[in-house]
């Protein structure tokens, strides 16, 4: 197939958007959450594990910046770091996620400790950051295009969670509201980079595989949570009820 003619920009964008069929909004764990069937433990488990993703996103974006020689791209991409880490004197998305944790009944210090992060989630997120460090900056930037589908998932939480989970403090939804606008802005930039960079059929097919890789990461995170919080089979469940898994190895 790589010998075929390249897709036009419109066709390539359509192929990218078609990957939305595999976005984690369709994972049974997410479906249960927005349909109101999730338990308190399942929501808390999702918030705690997703926090590891949140704190690593700036690491991913910093890797892209470090590998990118284009000053104009860096000037725009750096906003993603500020969105999550916060500008001087301002809170960012990480603090907003900590407030979401408090809203669902989790202690911020426990979230920061990452003691609840499942190995499967940690491995998936670490693979994403490692990819961003080793790939070309264009490929790493393009891997962020799961943001094409992000506004829908944030809106689904805002629409359904207040109705189904009145025990959650509404102040915790700030992160989802903020990301609605940020994700749409980020998509425009990431999509422009992608459509400009991948102009051969082989390159376009590789990009579709990169996007699938990112989708695999998001889906695998929820698979790990399903095992732990839906099937009650966390790591080592057959030999102990303690959380024996590692809490992160510093290299």
Curated annotation (Swiss-Prot):
Its EC number is 1.3.3.11. Pfam families: TENA_THI-4. It catalyses: 6-(2-amino-2-carboxyethyl)-7,8-dioxo-1,2,3,4,7,8-hexahydroquinoline-2,4-dicarboxylate + 3 O2 = pyrroloquinoline quinone + 2 H2O2 + 2 H2O + H(+). The keyword Oxidoreductase applies. One of its GO terms (molecular function) is pyrroloquinoline-quinone synthase activity. The keyword Transport does not apply. Pathway: Cofactor biosynthesis; pyrroloquinoline quinone biosynthesis. Keywords: Oxidoreductase, PQQ biosynthesis. One of its GO terms (biological process) is sulfur compound metabolic process. It is an enzyme of class 1 (oxidoreductase). Belongs to the PqqC family. PANTHER family: 4-AMINOBENZOATE SYNTHASE, PQQC-LIKE PROTEIN. Ring cyclization and eight-electron oxidation of 3a-(2-amino-2-carboxyethyl)-4,5-dioxo-4,5,6,7,8,9-hexahydroquinoline-7,9-dicarboxylic-acid to PQQ. This is Pyrroloquinoline-quinone synthase. It comes from Pseudomonas putida (strain ATCC 700007 / DSM 6899 / JCM 31910 / BCRC 17059 / LMG 24140 / F1). The lineage of its organism: Bacteria, Pseudomonadati, Pseudomonadota, Gammaproteobacteria, Pseudomonadales.
């Amino acid at each position: 197939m790589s010998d075929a003619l390249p897709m036009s920009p419109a066709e390539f964008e359509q192929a990218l958007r078609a990957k939305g069929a595999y976005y984690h909004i369709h994972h049974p764990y997410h479906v249960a959450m927005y349909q109101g069937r999730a338990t308190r433990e399942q929501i808390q488990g999702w918030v705690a594990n997703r926090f590891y993703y949140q704190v690593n996103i700036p690491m991913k974006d910093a890797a892209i910046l470090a590998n990118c020689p284009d000053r104009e791209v860096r000037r725009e991409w750096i906003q993603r770091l500020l969105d999550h880490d916060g500008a001087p004197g301002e809170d960012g998305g990480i603090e907003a996620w900590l407030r979401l944790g408090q809203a669902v009944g989790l202690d911020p210090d426990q979230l920061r400790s990452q003691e609840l992060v499942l190995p499967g989630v940690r491995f998936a997120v670490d693979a994403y950051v490692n990819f961003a460090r080793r790939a070309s900056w264009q490929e790493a930037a393009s891997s962020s295009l799961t943001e094409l589908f992000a506004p829908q998932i944030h809106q689904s939480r805002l629409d359904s969670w207040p109705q189904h989970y009145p025990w959650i403090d509404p102040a915790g939804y700030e992160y989802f509201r903020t990301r609605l606008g940020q994700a749409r802005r980020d998509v425009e930039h990431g999509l422009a980079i992608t459509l400009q960079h991948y102009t051969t059929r082989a390159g376009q097919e590789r990009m579709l595989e990169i996007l699938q890789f990112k989708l695999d990461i998001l889906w695998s995170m929820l698979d790990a949570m399903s095992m732990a919080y839906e099937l009650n089979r966390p790591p080592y469940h057959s030999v102990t009820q303690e959380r024996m898994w590692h809490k992160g190895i510093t290299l």
